[in-house]
Every structure is written in structure tokens, then in C-alpha cells.
Amino acid sequence: MDRRRIFKVMAATLLAVPFVNRKAAAAEGGKKAHKLAIHVDQNDADVMKLALNNTRNANELYKAAGEELAVEIVCYSQGLHMLRDDTSPVKAEIHELRKVVPQVAFGACNNTKTAMEKREGKPVPIIPEATVVPAGIVRLVELQEAGYSYVKP
């Protein structure tokens, strides 16, 4: 086979790949599932609100396209204040977001929680919408390894 023919076969193969992928997606029902991991590590109400708005906006766009979205907001370090029942500046917004995006999950870092409890000398209450995870950074790694896209507002 001469070089031109090899080149033509390679080019045709590369051009066909997107069409094969579309056919496969259509055969699976055409719904694409999206996964989003949002990282909050600052005690800043604006950053926290941005994380919630990112979640709301992504959900609206994917829902309008008929596509699914899984979201987990992981909070550690000073960002844990987002999920503290006693200090969260966005507790009401989280409650409201759960009504429109019920699939959103919130991960509260136990390492940070334990350090805050030691420093403050009292238990740190976490909002009921959140789940305590062993380590926030490890949770973010696990989510990325599971195919989640990482966003840090």
C-alpha cells in the first residue's frame, strides 16, 4: 500500500469516529450523564454563593437539554463554615437549592470538623443536608477518579 492510500484510510477512520460515537449515544437513549465536584475551602459567603449558583445554573442547563447531572459540593478548611449549622452564611440558600436540585450532595470534611472542635472546645454541628466524609481532599480525589469534573469557584 502506498503512503497516499494509507493516509486516506487513516483520515477516513478519524473522520468516522464522531459519527460512531453519536450513534452509540443514540442507541443508549441519548441521555448524557454529567458529574460535577465543587470545592469550597474559604469562609467567604460570596464564594459559597457562587458554588450554589454554579450548581443551580448547571442543573438548569442540563435539565433543559434532557441530560442528568450529579453534583457534590465538598467543603473543608475554612470552607466548612458553609456546612456548619451554627455559622453558615448560606444555610437558607442550601435548603432552597435542595428543593430545586434534590440530587446535590454536600460533603463535610471530618478532619476539619475535628480540628475545629478541638480548637473551639465544643461539638461542631453540621447541617442535615450534609454528609460527613473522612477527608475533604480525599473525597475530591475519589470524585475525580469516578469521572467528576472539578470546579473551584
Regions inferred by a protein language model and the residue ranges of each:
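N-terminal export signals
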Residues: 5-24
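A cross-taxonomic marker for long C-terminal extensions/tails that follow the last structured domain
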Residues: 84-153
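Acidic helix-start/capping segments at beta-turn-to-alpha-helix junctions
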Residues: 69-83, 112
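C-terminal segment of N-terminal export signals and the immediately downstream linker at the start
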Residues: 20-36, 43
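Short, glycine-rich nucleotide/cofactor-binding loops
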Residues: 40-52
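Short glycine-rich or small-residue beta-strand-to-loop segments that form or flank ligand, phosphate
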Residues: 35-42, 74-79
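Histidine-anchored nucleotide/phosphate-binding helix
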Residues: 49-64
